[in-house]
Amino acid sequence: MVDFATRVAKSFKDKVSGIDNKKGTDIQGVLGLDSTPNVLFASVFAAGGGSYDNFFYKVENGRADFRNFANKGTSYKNLEKVYNDYKNLIGSNGLFASKDGSYSSNFEKFHQLAFYVGSSSGYNYAFADETAKRLKFGDSAIEYPNDTLEIKAPTNNSQSGDGNGGTNNDNLLGTFDIREKSNGKKGESNGKQGNGQDKKTISLYKDSIPKEKTEGTDAILISDNQLINQLQTAAKTSSSQNKANTAAITFKQSNKSETDQSTTSQVIGYTTTASLKADKKNIFDVKKLNNEKSERKIIVGATVETLNQANTLQANEAIIKPAPGKYQSTDSHKVMITQGPNIVGIHANEKEDKETQKFINWYLNKEESWSVQNSGSTTTKKQTAAQYFAEQSSYITPLKNNFKADQSATKDSTVNTNYFTKQTFDLFKEVNDGKVLGFNDPSDFRSGKFRNTIGSTFNATISSKVDFNKFFENFKASLGSGFER
């Protein structure tokens, strides 16, 4: 896989630009890696015959033993081979490594990567709809986030609420609309219209919020001066454009039409609760509403670009294969990384142990009614909590009974409708049958730092292009002490 990607990158040098001058709308490379720690761990584990004795570390008696790594044993030698193979791809500008939330699928779906290695959990974000949208700012672009709402400029009819029925808009920066359940119970503000929902306007203010408004309920206070300036500038621009449009109305139109035209709100930004990294240039953190679980962002200085199917990747076009289970064809065992939440029982006392057992029984066996989003509409589905969680997360429920049953009959419905989980199901079945080795990071209190550090150090080499000795030196220095044994 790495060799093929390297050959492609070398064959199309003019299409794969260097890292220093790569724009967000350019081709990002040939091969994308969503998790470099996963790739390095799986490769070294497979190259070591699928044995933890040949891995960076193993856990014995609850503590990790790093001597194989520290003493430059088999894991060091295998890491050197893996690194040098990837270095050839890096030198050809053919590798993209995800960071800061920019997953490979964000570029793959817009034909900016040839292929990538990711997780089954990314299925819902891996493909474009029939018409996909992007937000562009300068040379950068992001996919139009889920749950995104337009921010409208203040209009002549906007009420800042000075308490005396005035219309002083000095503090009002803009507004956006959310949808709430019509029974009065507050729902998640996802902006989606549907039956049983009422529109509610949220106002954005600078300096202070009028006394008849409540922060977190129908108002948000903006404190970042750069964001305030950008919203105000966008509002002034839209106001000028609106006046020009009004002046162009012919005398044949009624006064009512002129009034309607002059009070039409213009889009000055966007707000979303999707997972985005604030850059304080175009994407800003703001306070969330009281009923929201996710952090809220405001996006400014962006234009919307709509792409048709010819420019995007749909699910029925993709070739989906399991990630390579061997680093070299001569490796003795095929390996699959298994990641996801684990249920860990911790003994407390007899009463709490019984309650934990009740929860596990409910989680795995008791069917409940769940609200499920499907093609823009909400339906109710009878599932166990485990099945619901797996379906919503694009995971599978790896129970032995599921693997014994005929795949088409399994209750884990995502197996039949989700291309990623079908592959994952088949691989887990091979693990269950002993044909594939399932790999999980051995863990103690140091393993998280080891994983994060090897990933960040490797990602840095995409621009630095250092040799293995320098990479290893940087890795050891970033790790610090505590990994000698």
From Swiss-Prot:
Residues 155-174 have a biased composition (Low complexity). It comes from the Bacteria. Transmembrane segments: none annotated. Residues 177-189 have a biased composition (Basic and acidic residues). Residues 151-201 are annotated as: Disordered. Belongs to the MG185/MG260 family. This is Uncharacterized protein MPN_147. The lineage of its organism: Bacteria, Bacillati, Mycoplasmatota, Mycoplasmoidales, Mycoplasmoidaceae.
